Amino acid sequence: MSTIVDVFAREVLDSRGNPTVEVEVFLEDGTMGRAIVPSGASTGAHEAVELRDGDSKRYLGKGVLQAVDNVNMIIAPEVIGMDATAQIDIDQLMIDLDNTPNKAKLGANAIMGVSLATARAAATHLAIPLYQYIGGVNAREIPVPMMNILNGGKHADNNVDIQEFMIVPSGAPNFAEGLRMGVEVYHSLKKVLNNKGLGSGVGDEGGFAPNLPSNEAALDLILEAIAAAGYQAGSDINLALDVAATELFKDGKYHLASSGQVLSSSEMVDFYAQMLEKYPLISLEDGLAEDDWDGWKQLTERLGSKIQLVGDDLFVTNSQRLARGIEEGVCNSILIKVNQIGTLSETLNTIEMARRAGYTCVISHRSGETEDSTIADIAVATNAGQIKTGAPARSDRVAKYNQLLRIEEELDVFAVYRGIKAFKR
């Protein structure tokens, strides 16, 4: 009864108004699972390939009809007849069908859609929540949200270098209270910005994107908003950054537009060390460029015992790149984005490898998101303890927060929210 009888893909829109792939998987008993694939703005060079049509006459070249056709014409005939609960077999079949190291033939957006829709169909068939289907009976940790409330870099049209300034309600007793704290600081920040005559327009992920003179000015505004909301920075709420430093890296140097500085890798490490002394930072993501391995090693040796160092573009959810990082002693945490690698099975394998090496895992959205809330379930399924899914605004971000509220309510007394302990430093 859990046999796949049909697979259908279509072109839909993401939160930026760009086309993306939606896949529906139908089972013999009438069950259907649906998944919509997100996309990134600052994408790592080593990510699996997101297939775009390149036809300038449709969606400015960003159409995904080729990926849709790859699902309907190539993948569907092969997976029809398979058992939806055989996730590993289905994912491996698609990897073999593609037969490229980065899923360039069929597209990670095609493969991921089928992979996640299959998992959702199987969970629905078994009449259990998706997080329980993926993670089993021990899936009960609700992640601490890292909420992007102020945007710079590629996520905003302003002069701030750092891409994401996040608040982390690490002092909350549970997820629902942590979310409330984050929402109150978010609205407090809007009021602070308006009072100072600064813009309160939002970036791709719902965070505000005012024109500010420096990265430090952004952090100072957030500290002011935390205090105005009645919370204590450093205990109730901590800060986290996603620098997306690959976007700043040119000709072997880091170019900070806001200050006009051009810094070496070691000077960037000094920059972060000084920032850590001044602000209650507990997580730093993509502090150096995706191929600056020597710089990353310096950063980890100097600050790895003081702060969570997250590799996103560096690792791209890829177990081979993570293995190199573990071997070289680089980072102590990995960002997990399913569409960077393309299948649920490979994602879970990477998480397991990270865990064995003592790395923390942060489950993440993309800047181009949808109403799909699967990553909320994945975060709980894997007991990751941390999630990045934007500001508490815009329905594409709030969909994940609302799903986590439902899961926490469903788990009731069995739900675990570790707060600051999820960061291990």
UniProtKB/Swiss-Prot annotation:
PROSITE patterns named in the record: ENOLASE
Provide the primary localization.
Answer: cytoplasm
Listed binding positions for (2R)-2-phosphoglycerate are 163, 337, 366-367, 388
- Co-factor binding comment: Binds a second Mg(2+) ion via substrate during catalysis.
Q: Does the keyword RNA-binding apply?
A: no
Among InterPro entries, the record links this protein to: Enolase, Enolase-like_C_sf, Enolase-like_N, Enolase_C, Enolase_CS, Enolase_N
Residue ranges the record marks as coiled coil: none
Tell me what reaction this enzyme catalyses: (2R)-2-phosphoglycerate = phosphoenolpyruvate + H2O
The enzyme's E.C. designation: 4.2.1.11
- Specify the pathway: Carbohydrate degradation; glycolysis; pyruvate from D-glyceraldehyde 3-phosphate: step 4/5
Q: Which family does it belong to?
A: Belongs to the enolase family.
Q: What is this protein for, i.e. what is its function?
A: Catalyzes the reversible conversion of 2-phosphoglycerate (2-PG) into phosphoenolpyruvate (PEP). It is essential for the degradation of carbohydrates via glycolysis.
Write down what this protein is called. Enolase
The species this protein was found in: Syntrophomonas wolfei subsp. wolfei (strain DSM 2245B / Goettingen)
Gene that this sequence comes from: eno
